[in-house]
Amino acid sequence: MEKKKILLVEDDQFARELYEEVLKDAGFEVNSAVDGLDGLAKIKIGGYDLILLDVMMPKMDGLDVLRSLINEPPAVKNGPIVLLTNLTNDPVIDTAYGLNAKGHLVKSDITPGELVDHVKKYTDESQLTESSPIADSSSS
């Protein structure tokens, strides 16, 4: 079975290396970006099953990345974009959902095991949506 491709866009080196290691150990292929500009360039190439996007980053924040994708979609379709943030109940999160983010994970609250569970859930859901003709008719 082909490994799911994850793009991790995270400027904090410790968090980025931790998430990379945890996800690789769980059987995912992980590419990383160190800031929003680097992340946007990789997202535009496309082909990722899931994108984990930090909100607060230098050069270009997560919301600016999401806005750019609305104006210039990727060459190859990507799976869902899930925010990585330490913000909870914040207007920034609502704004991100309005810009097509599919979820958010609070970095300070999530354990490595929970991260893997969430990533599996998002990658499985996106595969179901793409490959299942039932998904369209049953969405409520």
Where do the model's predicted regions map?
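Acidic catalytic/metal-coordinating carboxylates
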Residues: 4, 35-38, 61-67
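Conserved acidic carboxylate
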Residues: 10
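The feature encodes the CheY-like receiver
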Residues: 16, 58-61
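Charged docking surfaces used in two-component/phosphorelay signaling
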Residues: 17-25
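Acidic, metal-coordinating helix/loop segments flanking the phosphotransfer/catalytic sites
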Residues: 32-50
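Short amphipathic alpha-helix used as the core "switch/output" element in two-component signaling
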Residues: 41, 63-76
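Active-site residues of response regulator receiver
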Residues: 54, 85
